[in-house]
Design a protein with these regions (language model features):
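N-terminal Rossmann-like FAD-binding beta1-loop-alpha1 element of flavoenzymes
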Residues: 70-102
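Glycine-rich loop(s) and the adjacent beta-strand/alpha-helix scaffold that form part
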Residues: 241, 249-270
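Core beta-strand elements of the Rossmann-like FAD/NAD(P) dinucleotide-binding domain
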Residues: 70-73, 240-250
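A short, basic/flexible loop-to-alpha-helix module at the beginning of a structural domain
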Residues: 54-72
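Glycine-rich, acidic and aromatic/proline-enriched surface loops and short helix-turn segments
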Residues: 13, 174-177, 253-260
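Active-site- and interface-proximal helix/loop "cap" or "latch" segments in soluble metabolic
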Residues: 1-58
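Conserved N-terminal/central alpha/beta ligand/cofactor-binding core
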Residues: 99, 105-214, 263-270
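A conserved short coil-to-beta-strand element within the FAD-binding core of flavoproteins
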Residues: 217-231
Length: 270
């Protein structure tokens, strides 16, 4: 299970460390956390031990607020989904000794990306070649760009997307992410019965950790640090109610959530 595989180690450790199932749920895995906590509480009750009823809102005691010393990095990425991990991995692959920190407010990475069934509109992929599908010509790519361009998706963005898809496919394959099931012309899954998002996220997470990227889950960005009109990092707060600053030469915002902002939608996609 794409959620439970990530959530179980976190909720297990919390229960063992506190010697009780009355602990905070894993953010982004509320139902999975509830199932584990309820099962532990039931086992304790059957053993004759006292434990309070477990509900969907059961949480551990509130932690005292603390302010920690600031840390430094070359690059800090806010958001641990596919785009944030892609930025962090690319930075590390480009310059091996660069110090990269990724902060993600949820306890597990990816957000909704891990639930994506398809990788849409992948052009001239290895899976298409293996299936014997005719490779797109320059004219076909240009027609695709024209058809996909709209007020909400500029021709410039679509052009980069269309012309670099095969490069992206090769990049993913280099980290063991093989989208080998091609159907419906440009739709791709890992296998016929395996979603693309699950495999992409797992491969990117493994690659990021192998590269030595500092990934801090349960850590939300609070505000940008601005000095003389320039962003020099971000202030964060973790699940232990500890806040601190991450000072960095470069700050990358990859939090998503654009469609939840009425103001941004009104300005850029009316």
């Amino acid at each position: 299970n794409v959620v439970m595989d990530r959530a179980f180690p976190v909720i297990r450790d919390r229960i063992l460390e506190n010697n009780t199932p009355v602990v905070d749920s894993v953010t982004a895995a509320t139902f999975s956390s509830y199932g584990v906590k309820a099962a532990v509480a039931d086992a304790m009750a059957q053993a004759g031990l006292e434990v309070e009823d477990i509900t969907m809102t059961t949480a551990g005691p509130e932690k005292e607020a603390k302010t920690l010393e600031d840390v430094t990095a070359d690059i800090v990425v806010v958001g641990g989904g596919p785009s944030g991990l892609a930025a962090a991995i690319t930075a590390k692959q480009t310059k091996e000794d660069v110090n990269v920190i990724v902060v993600e407010k949820m306890d597990i990475l990816s957000g909704n990306g891990k639930f994506d069934m398809n990788f849409y509109d992948l052009i001239n992929s290895e899976a298409q070649k293996a299936a014997g599908n005719e490779q797109w010509t320059v004219n076909q790519v240009e027609n695709f760009i024209e058809a996909k361009s709209s007020a909400g998706d500029s021709p410039e963005r679509v052009k980069v997307w269309a012309e670099q898809e095969n490069v992206l496919d090769a990049w993913l394959r280099d980290m063991g992410v093989n989208l080998d099931y091609n159907y419906g012309a440009m739709n791709h899954m890992a296998k016929e019965d395996q979603y693309a998002g699950e495999v992409i996220q797992a491969g990117m997470e493994e690659c990021a950790r192998d590269l030595g990227i500092d990934i801090r889950t349960g850590t939300k960005g609070l505000d940008l640090i601005m000095e003389d009109g320039r962003c020099t990092g971000v202030t964060v707060e973790n699940n232990d109610n500890e806040s601190y600053g991450i000072k960095a030469q470069y700050t990358i915002i990859a939090t998503g959530g654009f469609c939840s902002s009425k103001e941004l939608l009104g300005e850029y996609a009316p």
